[in-house]
Amino acid sequence: MTQQTTESEVRSVPSAVSSYREEVTRDAATDSVSSRWAWVVFWVPAIGVLVVGASRVSRTACRFLVAEDHLLEWAQFGLLLLAALFAVLASIRLFGRRETLAGLLLVIFGIGMILVAGEEISWGQRIFGWGTPESLSAINNQRESNLHNVLGVQNTLNYLKMFGGLLAFLLPFWTRWSTRIQAAPSSTRTLLTRLSPALFLGPCFLLTFGYRFIRLFVLKTSETAIKFGEWPEFALYFGFAAFAFLLWRRLGQTDPVNQS
């Protein structure tokens, strides 16, 4: 009996993988994203892990990618601004549909993205060259004009990123396959669908959760792990920007949510 059960479970794995792949492709199609591009985005976080990891063999390449004021940090800043822009544009369309709660949540999300963008570049301190007030410098790990490097704030934000990444990864599964969600009022289903990222963006958020978990509980002081963190943050902000853009675009097209 046990052997038969094990064999059945083994046979069910390829079937589950196949079903998941089909669902990712189908889900991407609802956002007018081709299967090819959906799978490119799906694998980019993993490919980036390999690229950033390999860059450690070259000090120049590593610095170019992960040092302050270099490629990944400025790319993060740009993605955060894009996320804020499309979140606000999407909220305007949501208000036009009288989806007030979803619109307000997108406005809050957009404001949050602007605040994070400012924090990422220390509100322009290294661009304009102003000094850090002594009171802030004394409690800031990098002696910069930002709050996210203040020890207590930093720990809180790291936990928020970890659980936020996990929630963003799980929410699409919950909204698509939970019987409780399917039985909920249409307004609730619509709201959760609005807030749910595309399935192919899942690895962007899962990488963030995995990295933050390792940093918080395993590699607490590793300099290599700290520098590597620029890539999971890039993936997270890319996921946010893509989510906001796809929602904005979907709201401007024939809406599958309101058709169902």
What spans do the regions from the language model cover?
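Transmembrane alpha-helix/helix-exit interface in multi-pass inner-membrane proteins
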Residues: 114-134
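Alpha-helical transmembrane segments of multi-pass integral membrane proteins
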Residues: 38, 195-260
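Short, intrinsically disordered terminal tails adjacent to the first/last structured region
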Residues: 1-30, 253-260
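Hydrophobic alpha-helical transmembrane segments
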Residues: 143-167, 233-236
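Alpha-helical transmembrane segments
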Residues: 35-52, 200-206
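Juxtamembrane "helix-exit" motif on the non-cytosolic side of transmembrane helices
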Residues: 53-63, 178-179, 210-223
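N-terminal membrane topogenic signal
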Residues: 27-44, 192-196
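Interfacial segments of alpha-helical transmembrane regions
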Residues: 95-114, 183-201
